């Protein structure tokens, strides 16, 4: 899901470009793990205090994406866009909404976007629940 995304500094998508800059606090703290790109995604929490999981950790902090680090990509946390894709939102749904073209002020900031995504029911899960209710509706409500 995340492989085709540009790195934040190369993206013009505000939901990919802006992300939490919270520093690594040590493996004993919440949100200090690097996600596994080819495995089940992490729970996206609404209340993370900036400690959203890492997309990539440095070698010093136990990072496993050595090829990316050797290319000069740096340690960083997941972006709102990456969190939204993990939660099954459509790739064009906007979460970070700039107030102006200079991207200095925001209607919805990256921090606000993380909260929206973390509080949401994943769209594909909601769809399957709705379909199940629709299929059973006539059984329980005649």
Where are the predicted features?
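A conserved active-site cap/scaffold subdomain adjacent to cofactor or substrate pockets
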Residues: 1-4
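C-terminal target-recognition/interaction regions appended to catalytic cores
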Residues: 7-142
């Amino acid at each position: 899901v995340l492989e085709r995304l540009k790195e934040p500094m190369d993206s013009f998508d505000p939901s990919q470009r802006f992300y939490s800059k919270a520093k690594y606090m040590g493996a004993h703290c919440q949100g200090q793990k690097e996600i596994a790109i080819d495995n089940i995604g992490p729970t996206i929490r609404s209340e993370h205090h900036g400690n959203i999981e890492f997309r990539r950790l440095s070698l010093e902090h136990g990072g496993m994406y050595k090829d990316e680090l050797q290319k000069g990509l740096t340690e960083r946390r997941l972006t709102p866009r990456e969190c939204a894709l993990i939660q099954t939102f459509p790739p064009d749904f906007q979460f970070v909404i700039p107030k102006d073209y200079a991207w200095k002020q925001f209607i919805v900031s990256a921090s606000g976007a993380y909260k929206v995504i973390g509080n949401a029911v994943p769209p594909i899960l909601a769809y399957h629940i709705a379909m199940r209710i629709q299929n059973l509706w006539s059984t329980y409500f005649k």
